[in-house]
Amino acid sequence: MEKIFNHIDQHIEETIETLFKMVSQPSVSAQNYGFDKAPNLIKNILSDYGLNSQLLDTPNNGNPSIFGELKSNSNKTLMFYTHYDVQPPDPLELWESDPFKPEKRGNKLYGRGMSDDKGNIAARLAAIKAFLDIENKLPTNLKFFIEGEEEIGSRNLLGLIETYKPILKADACIWEGGGVNMSGSPLIYIGLKGGLTIKMSVNKLSVDAHSSYSPILPSSIDRLTKAMNSMKNDLGQIIIEGFHDAIIDLNKEQREAINSLPDDTKEWEDKFGVKLLGNDLESIDDLNMKLYSEPTANVNSIQSGYNGPGMKSVVPAYAECKMDFRLVPNQNPAEIYEYIKKHLIKKGFSDIEIEPLHQIFPFRTDMNSDLLDIVKTSAFEIYNKKPLVTPNMAGSGPMYEFGGLLKMPICSAGVDHPTHNMHAPNENITIDDLSLGAKHIALIMKRFSEI
């Protein structure tokens, strides 16, 4: 592998050039900005790197996905999942450079999508090019799936996979993301929480009323907050009947993996300005277990009454909120939605209207997977530090569509670092992270072909 690794280092400027080309083309899915050009740009880049590439039509006129494939003499097929859509760059005034005019400053590369997720695309292409240039072939059959709607919840991915299922089959998948923590230890996750987002609303009056009528008129915002509060007890535990019934307890290996995760409380406390340990979270093990293995119920937003400048004394006629529920493996978002509806009726909130906005299933790969063993051992060789494995991330994503529907184990491996400012101004990636990520991918490809 020494020749492959040397090639990655020797051609790093070419990799950066490819990355800059992708970052220069906006692809902001939340604003539907840049998709007249971005899909074909990515498709053509894959073709330039030797892959047979095509655009995959997305249901409901969604942003196209890009599919690339390259066969080898192997009987194994590895899938790469990434996405080319990015977050909005706002607030623009906090950027030190134009988010879509990438810049190199020292060892860092700046621009929207530099790390999430175009950096991962570039790193994987660098690994592919190294094998093709040095060995004239890949060690394993390869499929490259690049989504265009990940940042807006992959809302059309399920339908796309049902349509293109025959060409998307593979033996295993390397997920987008992954990378290292602050101390440089590789982070590998093998699962993602699912999710359900709902909108709840109530209209108690025909029009807003003067607040002097508040002693005799019902307040929609008061009614809505009571409905939301009914879903948790004073300890913040979810008390919706049936909500936890399907959850399967973590096994010994999964618990040990979570308990081996580092103590990041100080970093989080400094970042968010709160004290995390105390009350029901007595230790870092309690915190990590809650963060990575428990479902959640969270209020995203509340809209009601007057929120403009100055003051306006009213009894709000209408109120609405949006909530998201992060779900753990074996929870079904459709079933959870029904439990929420029944809960509201049972607690006397039949006047609250509820609407599902988005759902995604949870997924987790087995801790004894051959793929995980390959990703771990290769990570240790590249980064020279013991990798940390998380049975699933705290967040959600479309992993079930590949792992559950297409029946393949999934592990993450990537170029991420906590200082990359993903989803924030001045998103960046270091050249070292880009190079190490490419080498890790290359070694995974080689080892995967040998099992």
Which residues are covered by each model-predicted region?
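A short core secondary-structure module
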Residues: S214-L235
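An extended, acidic, His-containing surface patch that forms the Zn2+-binding/catalytic region
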Residues: M182-S183, I239-Y318, R326-Y339, K347, ...
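N-terminal helical capping/dimerization or prosegment-like subdomains
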Residues: M1-D90, Y318, K322, E335
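Active-site metal-coordination/substrate-binding segment of hydrolases
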Residues: K76-K143, L436
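A common structural junction motif
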Residues: D85, M231-L235, K341-S350
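Acidic, glycine-rich active-site loops and adjacent beta-strand->loop/helix elements
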Residues: N61, Y84-V86, K108, F145-S154, ...
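Acidic/histidine-rich catalytic neighborhood of metal-dependent amide-processing enzymes
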Residues: S115-G191
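Flexible glycine/proline-rich, aromatic-decorated loop/lid segments
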Residues: L187-N203, C411-V415
